[in-house]
C-alpha cells in the first residue's frame, strides 16, 4: 500500500467514532482530508463540524457539511486530526500545515482526540520532524533567540502566513525527552502564540495505518 492509501484507510476508520446528531471537530492536512471525504458520506446524519483551518472549512462546505464557529459550540465529542510525529505516550508534533494554534484550541474543547496517521509517523522520541512554533511577526527574532537557548535551531518558514496572520519558526535539532516541560517552556516565551507540541493534551485514540491494516491504540 502507498502512504496515501494508508492515510485513506485511517481517515475512513475514524468514521466509527462519529456519533449521529453531533458536531465533529476536524483537523487539517493530507490525512485529515481523507477523513473529511469520509465524513461527507454522513453529512445528513451529523449536525456539522468545527474546522481547524480555512482549507478544511472550504473542503467541508464543498461536501455540503455545515461548519460552525467554535464560539457557537459548548463542547465537542471528538476531534479527528493527523500528526507529523506521535510517540508511545500519545504525545505529538503537529503543525506541518501551519494550523497548529486552531488545532490545539479545538483539541482542548473535545472530549476525545483521535489521531489518524500512517505508521511512518510513529517514533520513540519526538523531535526528528522540525517543531513548528507560531509567532507574532514582530517577535520573530526575539523568540528565535530564546529557542536557541533551549537547544534548538530555528528557521523562519518562508512565504507562510497562518490563518491567524502570524509566522512559523520550525525548530530543528531537538531531541524532546520531556515533551510536557518543553511545551510549557516554549509557550511561556513572549511572542509565542503556541508550539506544535501536543503533550499536555495528547491523543486519546490513535488509528495507525499499516500494510496489515489499521492498528488502534487507546491511551
Swiss-Prot record:
<dbReference type="GO" id="GO:0004751">
    <property type="term" value="F:ribose-5-phosphate isomerase activity"/>
</dbReference>
<feature type="active site" description="Proton acceptor">
    <location>
        <position position="103"/>
    </location>
</feature>
<dbReference type="InterPro" id="IPR020672">
    <property type="entry name" value="Ribose5P_isomerase_typA_subgr"/>
</dbReference>
<dbReference type="GO" id="GO:0006014">
    <property type="term" value="P:D-ribose metabolic process"/>
</dbReference>
<keyword id="KW-0413">Isomerase</keyword>
<feature type="binding site">
    <location>
        <begin position="28"/>
        <end position="31"/>
    </location>
    <ligand>
        <name>substrate</name>
    </ligand>
</feature>
<dbReference type="InterPro" id="IPR004788">
    <property type="entry name" value="Ribose5P_isomerase_type_A"/>
</dbReference>
<feature type="binding site">
    <location>
        <begin position="94"/>
        <end position="97"/>
    </location>
    <ligand>
        <name>substrate</name>
    </ligand>
</feature>
<dbReference type="GO" id="GO:0009052">
    <property type="term" value="P:pentose-phosphate shunt, non-oxidative branch"/>
</dbReference>
<comment type="similarity">
    <text>Belongs to the ribose 5-phosphate isomerase family.</text>
</comment>
<comment type="function">
    <text>Catalyzes the reversible conversion of ribose-5-phosphate to ribulose 5-phosphate.</text>
</comment>
<feature type="binding site">
    <location>
        <position position="121"/>
    </location>
    <ligand>
        <name>substrate</name>
    </ligand>
</feature>
<dbReference type="InterPro" id="IPR037171">
    <property type="entry name" value="NagB/RpiA_transferase-like"/>
</dbReference>
<comment type="subunit">
    <text>Homodimer.</text>
</comment>
<comment type="pathway">
    <text>Carbohydrate degradation; pentose phosphate pathway; D-ribose 5-phosphate from D-ribulose 5-phosphate (non-oxidative stage): step 1/1.</text>
</comment>
<feature type="binding site">
    <location>
        <begin position="81"/>
        <end position="84"/>
    </location>
    <ligand>
        <name>substrate</name>
    </ligand>
</feature>
<protein>
    <recommendedName>
        <fullName>Ribose-5-phosphate isomerase A</fullName>
        <ecNumber>5.3.1.6</ecNumber>
    </recommendedName>
</protein>
<dbReference type="Pfam" id="PF06026">
    <property type="entry name" value="Rib_5-P_isom_A"/>
</dbReference>
<dbReference type="GO" id="GO:0005829">
    <property type="term" value="C:cytosol"/>
</dbReference>
Amino acid at each position: 500500500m502507498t502512504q496515501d492509501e494508508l492515510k485513506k484507510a485511517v481517515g475512513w476508520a475514524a468514521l466509527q467514532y462519529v456519533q449521529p446528531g453531533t458536531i465533529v471537530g476536524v483537523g487539517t492536512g493530507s490525512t485529515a482530508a481523507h477523513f473529511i471525504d469520509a465524513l461527507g458520506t454522513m453529512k445528513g446524519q451529523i449536525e456539522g463540524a468545527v474546522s481547524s483551518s480555512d482549507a478544511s472549512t472550504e473542503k467541508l462546505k464543498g461536501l455540503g457539511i455545515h461548519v460552525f464557529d467554535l464560539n457557537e459550540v459548548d463542547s465537542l465529542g471528538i476531534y479527528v486530526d493527523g500528526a507529523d510525529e506521535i510517540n508511545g505516550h500519545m504525545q505529538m508534533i503537529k503543525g506541518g500545515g501551519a494550523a497548529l494554534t486552531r488545532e490545539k484550541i479545538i483539541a482542548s474543547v473535545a472530549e476525545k482526540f483521535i489521531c489518524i496517521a500512517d505508521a511512518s509517523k510513529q517514533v520513540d522520541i519526538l523531535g526528528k520532524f522540525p517543531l513548528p512554533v507560531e509567532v507574532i511577526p514582530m517577535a520573530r527574532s526575539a523568540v528565535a533567540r530564546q529557542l536557541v537557548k533551549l537547544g534548538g535551531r530555528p528557521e523562519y518558514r518562508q512565504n507562510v502566513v497562518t490563518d491567524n496572520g502570524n509566522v512559523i519558526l520550525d525548530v530543528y535539532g531537538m531531541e524532546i525527552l520531556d515533551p510536557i516541560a518543553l511545551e510549557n517552556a516554549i509557550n511561556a516565551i513572549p511572542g509565542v502564540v503556541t508550539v506544535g507540541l501536543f503533550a499536555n493534551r495528547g491523543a486519546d485514540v490513535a488509528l495507525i495505518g499499516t500494510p496489515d491494516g489499521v492498528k488502534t491504540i487507546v491511551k
